[in-house]
Amino acid sequence: MNEKELKAIVINIARMGGWLIHHDLPAMNIRGRWATHVEGDVGFPDLVLLSPHYGQLIFVELKSARGRTTSSQDNWLDSLGLAGIEHHVVRPDDLDFITHRLTRPDLYKN
């Protein structure tokens, strides 16, 4: 399963659980390069999920089974952890966990 397929599955699970979802879509520029027109530091996680019913916030970095995080992504994830913010690197093997996490937020404390 590639990252795009994984993203679609995780977003569908989040929607079923009533989460608000933010994802920046990359766009191809005139030179044929992929670019996301957002200002900020590189490596920002792929998804930001917010449960309006439980007041829970989760940042998600999506990776294929063999995908590796970059040093910029690791910096973001480490910084989120230092701030006490829930974050996960989600791979296809993590679908059971993320499904449970997003469909049963009542079982997780803030």
Predicted regions mapped to residue ranges:
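Catalytic phosphate/metal-binding cores of nucleic-acid and nucleotide-processing enzymes, i.e., regions
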Residues: 1-110
